[in-house]
Amino acid sequence: MLSLAENRKTIKGFSGGMMVHSGYQYGGDNPFNLNISSPTFGIGGCAKIHLTDHFRTGMEGFFSTAPIRKGVQSGSYNKLFWTGIPCDWFWQKGKVAPYIGATLGGGMETAFYLFEGDKHDWEPEVKALLRKQPFLAFDPYVGIEYAVGKALRLTLRADWLLAFHKEGLNMPTGPRVYLGFIFAH
């Protein structure tokens, strides 16, 4: 049984760690009618404080890079970086803790299109384009954590980043699956 002082704690615990992810981006948001359809890979992390026995919030940040091969030269890519404040609800059942939540924040899409040339030389490329587009990020996610020990958890998470800019929904978009480790107290 928890003592009255422990029950009144504002912060019930904290957790944080790193995750790698893989997914798929599709769609096009460019004047060249390039339909981006590519696997994407990345890394990121989170740090959260547990405010109740079932609710936690904090900060997180990730980046994800998708190589583009259709309609452009090798070396072209679409990169997403986003950071924000995650809020999720979790339910601890023995060693397993499923969770559901969303992150609200912002980010930047960087698109690099190489139309002619070679990425392996040191020559200036005349037909290349680099564009950066800031966006508002809303990232719903679901996941599950498994306690390996007292302080170490493995996490598996899936999300679908929705990035909005002044014209509406930013494309490309798509799902991602994360695998990582979380240290918790």
Spans of model-derived segments:
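Acidic, glycine-rich flexible loop segments
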Residues: 126-142, 146
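Extracytoplasmic loops and strand-loop junctions of Gram-negative outer membrane beta-barrel proteins
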Residues: 26-30, 69, 122-128, 162-163
